[in-house]
A protein has these predicted regions:
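Conserved beta-strand in the GNAT
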Residues: 52-54
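Core segments of cupin and vicinal oxygen chelate
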Residues: 8-50
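Long C-terminal interaction/binding lobes of large macromolecular proteins
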Residues: 60
Length: 121
């Protein structure tokens, strides 16, 4: 089906969330973190739970992963089977997201970030 979402590390969550909401018109889906200190902000520009998620922290700005949305759960299973057959390292094996109920898995790629294959949610 296409690109589902992108997750990036962004040390300045406030400035980044402001960019996406005020300039690009995204809406905040949720904010997560302990004791009122945001560690992650999920934003959307369509009916999905999140189109982009921003993870805070002191590390460098970089892509954590992007998600490719499949047409069916069978497509997710087939992609996982192929990844395992060719020896692609699994970053996160098959499971369901708590926030959007997406069924997915994450694989490593040569660019040093993960690619998530998912369906539903």
């Amino acid at each position: 089906m296409g690109l589902g979402h992108l997750v990036v590390y962004q040390p300045d969550l406030d400035a980044s969330a402001k960019f996406y909401t005020e300039l690009l018109g995204f809406r905040v889906s949720d904010v997560a973190g302990p004791l009122g200190r945001p560690m992650a902000v999920s934003l959307h520009c369509n009916p999905r739970h999140h189109s982009i998620a921003l993870f805070g922290g002191s590390g460098p700005r970089r892509i954590n992963h992007f998600m490719l949305e499949c047409n069916s759960l069978d497509d997710v299973g087939s992609a996982r089977d192929i990844a395992r057959q060719v020896g692609t390292p699994m970053v996160i094996d098959l499971g369901r997201h708590m926030n959007d109920h997406m069924v997915s898995f994450h694989v490593a790629n040569p660019s040093q970030f993960a690619i998530e294959y998912g369906w539903g949610g």
